[in-house]
Amino acid sequence: MIFAAGLGTRLKPYTDHCPKAMVEVAGKPMIAHQLMKLKRAGFTHVVINVHHYAEQIISYVDANQGFGLKVTFSDERGQLLDTGGGIRKALSLFDTTNPVLIHNVDIFSNADLAALYAKHIESGNDASLLVSKRDTSRYFIFDDKDSLMAWKNIQTSEVRTSNNDLRTTLDQVNGDDATYRLRAFSGIHIIAPTLFPLLEKQDEVFSITNFYWQQSSQHAIRGIEAPQGFRWVDAGKPEALAKAGEIVRESYK
């Protein structure tokens, strides 16, 4: 599934008259690069959620015959549902016998999506989150077995966790030690069908990152560390488009 429903506020003025997914990187709309990358990784069916200037995305993908993929649209024009709500709404469009890879339309990386998906299958995780060690203000906290323990904003020191018996300990985590590590989320993750019933029970609008830490004490929600040499950029800001173009030219082949 590709998240493409956002308003693209950070990308103004590019998104004044088009959706973020249609902003060009290296000569093509973001959505084209992501669909082609998923196809090269062996995926055959992609769900795209749409909201802001949705008809532009739908028309473009249809005009290109889905880039050789089966593409289904999850229409959020009536209401933006946030990341978790977007997945929840799209559940009926998924093949519920297989895990679903989720990818933000504005995330560009050299991640090997086929290898990531295979690693998730092998792990038996309920959810696998591609993470890396990079500077940010918001992190996931994992234990030494890669299990998700909490979410933390290091600027405000806010910690969110369902592991309440460890809250005092987790409050003190500000870097890597023998037991815990801070890792940044990449916006690429895989959800197993075991979590679909829980997603269905959530409110209509909710964040998937909140869902993950809320469920982490009861389910196998784990991080998968990006390999050495990992390149990544959030192309949601104008100044990041050039770096996204570099990654496309190097890795989207």
Task: Cite the ranges covered by each PLM segment.
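N-terminal nucleotide-binding beta1-loop-alpha1 segment
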Residues: 1-16, 39-41
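Conserved N-terminal catalytic core of the sugar/cofactor nucleotidyltransferase
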Residues: 2, 28-104, 115, 202-203
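Active-site metal-binding loops of divalent metal-dependent hydrolases
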Residues: 7, 105-107
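Short catalytic helix/loop segments, enriched in acidic residues and glycine
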Residues: 17-32
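Catalytic-core segments of class I nucleotidyltransferases/pyrophosphorylases
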Residues: 99-101, 108, 114-121, 134-135, ...
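A short, conserved acidic/glycine-rich loop-to-beta-strand motif
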Residues: 123-133
